[in-house]
Design a protein with these regions (language model features):
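Helix-loop-helix "hairpin" substructures at the membrane interface of multi-pass membrane proteins
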Residues: 125-201
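Loop-to-transmembrane alpha-helix initiation sites
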Residues: 55-62, 85, 89, 128, ...
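Transmembrane alpha-helical segments in multi-pass inner-membrane proteins
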Residues: 192-243
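Short loop segments and helix-boundary regions at transmembrane helix junctions
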Residues: 20-33, 43-109, 205-217, 234-237, ...
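Membrane-interfacial amphipathic/re-entrant helices at transmembrane-helix boundaries
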Residues: 1-13, 55, 84
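Transmembrane helix-bundle core of multi-pass membrane transporters
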Residues: 79-146, 274
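Cytosolic-side transmembrane-helix boundaries in multi-pass membrane proteins
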Residues: 32, 48, 242-274
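Small-residue-rich segments of transmembrane alpha-helices in multi-pass membrane proteins
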Residues: 35-45, 90-102, 123, 167-177, ...
């Protein structure tokens, strides 16, 4: 349990930050679509009997993810008759179906489909944790250096256009780096857990705070709590770790949403009395 706990402590901080960007952009399902594209690349590697932790497998998965980054940056036009969420949904469904088709030809297809969805974070190794932590730290520094442009495009898209930013270029850069992070994490965590780490803590932070810094702090706490609690639940009750963490996140989101509604009702009641 030690290294899975270390992974749940060291790795989610960047996912929460990227999740805030995704939620503010209003393209919630882009993360699960990108994760599924990375998983499709891994399925290709499985079909050709490549080592899953090899650089070749990582390169194939990253190539599929970058293809998705290119598609989503092109389709995210300022004015378009087709909503980008429709393109994202289509990409996810096609990638998921293609993955199932590929794994149907693999010797251990059923097991790989399960790993693709929920991963097996209990089997994470020290090398996998430190490699991903180093990558996430590099991406975090990259985002910090370019934070003004990234934040402007995500949080004030019209303002970015008015200031003359090449929004499509910044979109591709964001999606490409985002895809790099997703590709590295999806192998140990699975598609559903990647989606949960990206979206649920960010939504919890938005429910409880207005300032971006406070949302990040709340999101980090929720990611830490949900990950560790889910791991212990899976250990005590002999449950799949990824699915247990996802369901724990769901329970936390329900509780926080109810608390946020109660808080809003309380504020309105006080305002009416005054």
């Amino acid at each position: 349990m030690f290294w899975p706990i270390v992974a749940c402590v060291l790795l989610p901080w960047l996912l929460v930050y990227l999740g805030l960007h995704v939620v503010q952009r209003g393209i919630i399902f882009i993360d699960i679509a990108m994760a599924q594209m990375a998983a499709l690349g891994i399925c290709v590697a499985v079909l050709f009997r490549l080592e899953l932790e090899s650089w070749t497998t990582f390169g194939i998965a990253l190539a599929f993810t970058l293809a998705g980054a290119g598609i989503f940056s092109v389709t995210g036009k300022r004015t378009s008759q087709i909503p980008q969420e429709a393109v994202i949904g289509i990409a996810y469904v096609v990638a998921a179906a293609a993955a199932v088709l590929l794994l149907s030809r693999a010797a251990e297809g059923d097991e790989e489909i399960k790993n693709m969805l929920v991963g097996n974070i209990l089997l994470v190794t020290p090398r996998e944790v430190w490699e991903r932590f180093a990558l996430f730290a590099a991406v975090g520094i990259f985002h910090f250096v370019l934070r003004r442009s990234f934040l402007l495009v995500s949080f004030d898209r019209e303002g970015a256009y008015q200031k003359g930013l090449r929004v499509r270029y910044w979109d591709f850069l964001f999606y490409a780096v985002f895809g790099l992070v997703v590709t590295s994490f999806v192998r140990i965590a699975g598609v559903l857990l990647v989606f949960s780490y990206l979206i649920v803590p960010a939504v919890c932070g938005i429910n409880l705070a207005q300032r971006t810094v406070n949302r990040l702090l709340i999101g980090w706490f929720i990611a830490l709590l949900g990950g560790i609690a889910g791991l212990f639940l899976s250990y005590w009750w002999d449950l799949p770790s990824g699915a247990a963490i996802v369901c724990t996140f769901g329970a936390l989101l329900i509780l926080i949403s109810l608390f946020a509604l109660w808080q809003q009702h309380r504020v309105r009641s006080v305002a009416i009395q005054d």
